[in-house]
Amino acid sequence: MRNDMQRPRSNENQNAAATTRWIANAAVASLPVLAYFLGGATQKWEEGVVITFLALYLLARPPRFSLGALTNLVLLTLFILAAVAFLPASWFFQPEWRAALVNDLRIQLPSTLTPQPWITLTYLLSFAAGLSWLYVVSTQDLELREVRFQLRLFTSGIALLAAISIAFYSAHTTLAFWHNERNFGPFQNRNQTGDLFGLAGIMILACAQDDLRRGRKWWIVWILALVVIVVATILSLSRSGIGILFVGSAFWLGAFAFRQRSPSALALGVSFLLLLLTALLLFDGQIFERFRLRDFRSASISTDFWWRIFHDTFRLIRNSPWCGIGFGNFESIFAIFRGASPGDRRALHPESDWLWLWTELGWPAVVLTIVGIALLVNRVFPLRVGTNQGYRLAALIAALLFAIHGIVDVSGHQVGTAFAVVFLLGLSRHRPLSLNTSQWMSILFRVVGLVLLGTSLASVVAARGEKLLPGSVGVSSAKRLSAVTDREGNFSETIALTTRALRWAPLDWQLYLTRAVAEVELRETANAIDDFRRARFLEPIACEVPLAEGNAWLPYRPMLAVAAWREALRRAGPLRPEVYASMLSDASLTSPEVSPILEEIGLSEHDLALPYLRRVSDASFNRALAQLLRNDPNLHSFSETEKLALFALWSERGDSEEISRVVVQRADWLRYAWLGMAKYKASKGDFRAAYELTQRYGEPVAVPRVARNLSLQDLENRFHAAPDSYGIGYELYRAQMQNGRVDEALLTARHFSERPNSPAYFHFLEAQCWAEKQNWERAWNAWQAFQSTQVRATK
């Protein structure tokens, strides 16, 4: 009787344990999928949500096994290297950039090696979460079917999200927390989206092969999922994603065929690769163009940019301590070292995961990372039959290709991709595990879980509620709040917010710029000058910094505004005309100190002359134009396009008699000044000469194509049936002119030209009719109506 009662209780315990294990397995496999879904966890609140779930898992099911003394030593040393940044800076080599920040710019840096310890601490906690995740997935005591379950659940989750990405892209919509500019996928960086799809594609091959081997029809579903992944990878426009998918598939199929030692298996693998390549070409015929295989000259552009970024990164490494500059400091400090890699955008990273790691943690961290990967890969072997060898090989290939790709990209520095790769690497291990249990590991990771839970929850709450939490979250909140107070005119509060945030991020140029603008409004001139100088030093590329400085100084210290604007023009590069045009406000043009200087700048630079002439008053236009011609009488510095634009503006706003006088002296300028000359001829009553100039030098007019050769009678019948059809109207006009029926053609053209929204070319056709009738004045007037309609249409 007692045994009968114990048996159901034992079954209940077994069922409860099985349910618990199933939930735990599903949670582990779903965490990287959740990170991908939450915008790739690129925002701090998204990362906080992911780490919160990881922390809860650590508290509920902490790792019970140890990875071994050597692996533990490597991971512990990596964490210590990251924490070295909090040691006193005086213990290490003092780089020149730190001396410049402290001595020249008088920035109050903390005494730690990292110039921004609160920012470094934020990233250190994320690093600790990554190491904890590695330990969790690598020490799971799983049965072989549980390994398959986790890998299949992860792969199907990514395939489902790929399908959702395609659906959103087709519907021209997206989720609020997805950050891609093209509305495809969650990541802002297309390579991170493509890489994750490529990894999933490799895993799909293993899943499909396993179902096919076991005689299950699920392999059909996996093939459909692979099609979705291929389409999504192509739509992501990621070369690296396509490369990982194709190369990884080739390695896995090659290894599969080699292990089978069967010609049919080899043929099947080759056939599948050819089929995959065919699918890629069918979906995207320009795939080779994207890999730049057709144009070696253009291929060298991106390669050259990489090498220049790498060159400047190595300059930063040489000018920094052996242990790096600390987490979270690359962007701020690298801007100071950009010499060989100039550009109009701020470099957020060195285009390489490995160089990024080297810069922030030093070369020992790179060596230890390679050793750690080697130790983990060593635990993958042997790949014997009956050990999920197909799944594990696919996971290993995917992880290694991702690490290799990290040489020239930075996908490993995002939670959404890093957690996925760590998951695959951890499940590629040979099981059952040959690891020793350790009670200390459970205690350690529960403590880590508590720390991560507290910090991640605080991060989520602070990010969503714009709380001033010390670290990167608080800095972002302070920027948003200071923007609000600045718009409201509460400049004292703006200064207070930015000053507080600068204690956490003393190398943030945006904070100095915002504070400086507020200081100008409060007449704190000395402080504003210092903060503007700091902002320009920390952001030496963007023209927006000195442009904003000049705008702030203009009402109070005009000469300081001019100095800042000169720097903005120096930085602007090809954007100089737009930047200069933004300076030509009513306030600057009416300022007695600024206006002459802006005129001097505009009339001495060929690319700035047109913005200046467009902005000056009609009374000043002719005087400014005369000065321009004195500075450059032959317009040698102007390009052909600039000459055409200059004379078009001159014809519109200038003195037509002066244009005539200049063209008489310089006959070769007639091809630029023909419109002004035509207006001059018309003003003198010579409408024929005016009209003929438009026909000689005017641009060809776009008119509808005539594909049919219908008779005049047929066209008249069609026109009477559809009198509002522009195409039929043009065909009828054309047939009437060919048959010499000019008066009827004129009526047809005017039928449309007198309507307000008709195409501009009907005015042109009307002008042709009047010219055919020798009525040159009306031909000229009709052509002017055509030109004005075209101008309105382009605005």
What is each model feature region?
Residues 1-156, 206-223, 250-275, 374, ...:
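Transmembrane signal-anchor hairpin modules in multi-pass inner-membrane enzymes, especially those
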Residues 26-33, 155-158, 221-227, 348, ...:
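Loop-to-helix entry and N-terminal half of a specific, functionally important transmembrane alpha helix
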Residues 37-49, 165-168, 188-191, 223-254, ...:
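Helix-loop-helix junctions and helix-breaking kinks within/between transmembrane helices
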Residues 53-58, 202-204, 244-253, 274-275, ...:
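Transmembrane alpha-helices of multi-pass inner-membrane enzymes
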Residues 77-90, 129, 146-176, 188, ...:
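Hydrophobic alpha-helical transmembrane segments
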Residues 88-91, 169-178, 227-237, 241-245, ...:
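A membrane-periplasm/extracellular boundary helix in multi-pass inner-membrane enzymes
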Residues 189, 307-348, 354-357, 361-367:
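TM-adjacent membrane-interface loops and short helices in multi-pass inner/ER membrane proteins
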Residues 461-669, 678, 683-684, 698:
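Soluble catalytic regions of membrane-associated enzymes that act on cell-envelope
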